[in-house]
Each structure stands twice: as structure tokens, then as C-alpha cells.
């Protein structure tokens, strides 16, 4: 990139590539900024990370972080909407990174201030338990972050009591699991990555004031009751929510 008349009223900034660069645009009043292979473009700025770039690293954690960072950069470059608010973008990047599905840009519904609110209560230690509908959703939550924040994750799907309750009441096991979870952890953060009947059960419990979730992540997937369950959870405006709309979702 290059800056003409830097610091003056006539200042102009141009971001370009070596292939498209026109030397005729540069004169004695121009400052030229040269990036490297790690430089990237974001919000009208050319950003080059500080430090020395290593082609290879033997640290497993470093390799994983490097892959994630490069993945996020790739995703951000391919987003159609370049003016997404930072809190929405943070959640969207993770959703696309997990699914490799850029339709998330259109179907990920985020309540106003939901990400900010959830981030705040998580970091303030106000969330002690996360409830998931299935074990796969529980397995996908980073263990290191949970340990650092002192948060426990519970899934009642494999609980014998849930199986017995499901048989007795004629409901699904995930539905029974959420019913049990609401009795023991009514104010938990509830995460759904598979079962629409479980999300519908939570909605029913909220209406009956038997559950008071501090937040809801609603991403059940499939063809039966999926869209209906997501429509049911939307009206609870007092609860911060992230919803993958339509049939898509997943743990």
C-alpha cells in the first residue's frame, strides 16, 4: 500500500498488490508500505503481525493456533458482507470455521447484544454450568477454556433416569434430559446441536417458569420439528440467543 501527503488534509491511502501496483502513482510525497506473506487486509487497513514468522514449528499448540488463524483469515476474505459488527463477526467466523458453510452469513441469527452479554457473564463467572442436548455438542466445547473459567458441562442423554423418564412419559430421551436439567440447573447456558424436541421442551419449561436460562445456542439440525423449534425460541427476547435458522445446524 502507499500513502500520499501523509498527515495533511490531502492525505490519501491506497491498498494494492504488487501485481496491480502502478509506479506512476508514487512521487516524493508518497510513503510506500510493503507487507509480507502474513499481511492481510481488514476494515480498510493493511495489517502485518509483529514478530518473526516461522515456516515450521514443533509445538503442537502453535500448529493448531496457526491453522485456526489462517482459516479465519481465509473466511474473512470470502465474506460477502464486509461491514459486519465485530461481535457478530466473531460468532460468525466460528460458525463458518466449524461447518465450512458460508450460508451461515445469512442464516446465523444473533439477538442484539447477545454475544456481548454472553461474553460478559461467562468472564464474570456467572455461568457455572452449560447444558447440551447431546454428547457430541458437549465434546465440542474447549476443555481448556472450561477449566480456566471453572465451568462444568452436563448432558443428560446417557443418564439412566432420562431413559426411564422418556419411557414413562412417552417422550424423547433428549427431551427427558432437558426436563431433568431444568430441575437441577434452571439458570444454565443451554446449547442445542442436534435435537429439536429438546429445544421445544426448554421453550415449554421457560413459559411455565420452570427454567430461566442465562443464554441459548439453538442449532438443532434435520427435517422434523427443526424449524418449528427455532421459531418457538425466538420470542424470548429477555434471553440472549444465537440461532442457526432453517434446517441447518449441528453440534
Residue locations for each model-derived region?
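Electropositive, gly/pro-rich neighborhoods at or near active sites that engage anionic ligands
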Residues: 59-128
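Conserved mixed alpha/beta catalytic, RNA-binding, or beta-rich assembly cores of soluble enzyme
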Residues: 134-206, 213-215, 220-222, 226, ...
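General beta-strand structural signal in soluble alpha/beta enzymes
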Residues: 2, 130-132, 155, 191-192, ...
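Short coil/turn connectors at secondary-structure junctions
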Residues: 26-29, 125-128, 148-152, 184-188, ...
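Short Gly/Pro-enriched loop/turn and capping motifs at secondary-structure junctions
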Residues: 6-10, 37-40, 195-198, 221-224, ...
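A contiguous loop/helix-start segment that scaffolds small-molecule binding in enzyme catalytic cores
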Residues: 1-59
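A structural signal for small-residue-enriched, beta-sheet-centric alpha/beta enzyme cores
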Residues: 220-251
Amino acid at each position: 500500500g502507499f500513502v500520499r501527503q501523509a498527515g495533511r488534509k490531502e492525505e490519501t491511502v491506497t491498498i494494492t498488490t504488487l501485481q496491480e501496483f502502478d509506479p506512476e502513482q508514487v512521487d516524493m510525497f508518497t510513503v510506500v508500505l510493503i507487507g509480507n506473506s502474513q499481511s492481510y487486509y481488514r476494515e480498510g487497513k493493511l495489517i502485518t503481525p509483529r514478530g518473526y514468522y516461522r515456516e515450521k514449528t514443533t509445538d503442537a499448540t502453535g500448529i493448531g493456533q496457526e491453522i485456526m488463524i489462517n482459516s479465519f483469515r481465509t473466511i474473512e476474505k470470502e465474506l460477502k458482507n464486509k461491514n459486519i459488527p465485530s461481535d457478530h463477526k466473531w460468532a460468525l467466523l466460528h460458525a463458518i470455521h466449524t461447518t465450512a458453510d458460508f450460508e451461515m452469513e445469512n442464516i446465523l441469527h444473533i439477538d442484539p447484544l447477545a454475544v456481548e452479554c454472553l461474553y460478559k457473564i461467562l468472564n464474570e463467572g456467572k455461568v457455572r454450568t452449560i447444558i447440551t442436548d447431546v454428547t457430541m455438542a458437549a465434546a465440542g466445547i474447549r476443555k481448556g477454556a472450561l477449566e480456566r473459567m471453572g465451568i462444568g458441562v452436563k448432558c443428560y442423554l446417557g443418564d439412566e433416569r432420562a431413559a426411564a423418564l422418556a419411557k414413562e412419559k412417552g417422550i424423547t430421551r433428549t427431551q427427558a434430559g432437558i426436563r431433568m436439567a431444568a430441575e437441577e440447573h434452571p439458570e444454565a447456558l443451554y446449547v442445542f446441536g442436534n435435537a429439536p424436541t429438546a429445544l421445544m421442551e426448554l421453550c415449554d419449561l421457560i413459559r411455565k417458569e420452570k427454567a430461566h436460562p442465562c443464554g441459548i445456542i439453538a442449532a438443532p439440525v434435520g427435517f422434523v420439528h427443526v424449524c418449528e423449534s427455532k421459531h418457538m425460541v425466538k420470542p424470548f427476547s429477555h434471553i440472549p440467543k444465537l440461532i442457526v435458522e432453517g434446517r441447518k445446524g449441528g453440534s
